[in-house]
Swiss-Prot record:
Single GO biological process annotation from the record: positive regulation of Ras protein signal transduction
Keywords on record: Cell membrane, Chemotaxis, Cytoplasm, Membrane, Repeat, Sensory transduction, Transducer, WD repeat
WD repeat windows: 60-90, 102-132, 148-177, 189-219, 231-261, 275-305, 317-347
Family per record: Belongs to the WD repeat G protein beta family.
The protein's name: Guanine nucleotide-binding protein subunit beta
Amino acid sequence: MSSDISEKIQQARRDAESMKEQIRANRDVMNDTTLKTFTRDLPGLPKMEGKIKVRRNLKGHLAKIYAMHWAEDNVHLVSASQDGKLLVWDGLTTNKVHAIPLRSSWVMTCAYSPTANFVACGGLDNICSIYNLRSREQPIRVCRELNSHTGYLSCCRFLNDRQIVTSSGDMTCILWDVENGTKITEFSDHNGDVMSVSVSPDKNYFISGACDATAKLWDLRSGKCVQTFTGHEADINAVQYFPNGLSFGTGSDDASCRLFDIRADRELMQYTHDNILCGITSVGFSFSGRFLFAGYDDFTCNVWDTLKGERVLSLTGHGNRVSCLGVPTDGMALCTGSWDSLLKIWA
């Protein structure tokens, strides 16, 4: 009896592999060109050396910065550090607007809500903590704790003031009702820690990147995985939607960033260099999508030409790993955060 079942399982695996091979073959037939070939005659970007400079240094954290996120007003940003503080900054004046003490200093992620009413954070406490910035209490206290993950919280992103998506080391993502503190949908299909999420511009989908070296596209309405993207050879640490919502970028421990197209269901470009041997911690796109910004373990932030796959600039200035970065929605600046306890705003 058991041998029959075992044989059926083996046959099912063979059938699945055969179908996958068929899908790959059909996809290759449709792939009549590559992005590199298509953009070969496109004029290169002008020299960027000295054009992008540090315009603001945000000093205030006393330990490694692990995460930052811009508000949609393009002025304020939130940062999370292992000094046990969540700081809300005015990026223009460099003033600290709020200093929120955390219950757990082992924080790994933070997020600003679209209305700028709330910020969220989480980490090794397995909890997503929500703070109301409109609260009259000082210091601001946690107003909601979302507690269902069985592993560390690696990333969180608001859809609106009432809903937030979290990813975790328990290999799942969860969509939460912030008001009630309850779980709406659990997304489970990864075979490794989920490290990063990025929500689509229309708020109907999100991308996740994980330690199983895959990125997955999820439908927030059905709760199902719609597409799986492979190609990386190590953990995916960062994912970010392309501005038009039809593609997304990834950064991995295999020392490469990649661009995947959702409609073509395939990888479009790799961003690598012989001199780059370290992992990528974070990725972001310029307003137009022509630049891909990537933070690296070697203390640098590299700027890539998205269409041609060439490195156009390397931003140096941090004294330790660049752990996070972000571009505001108006695309007017780039903020990098580092283990050197500093945030830098470039423009």
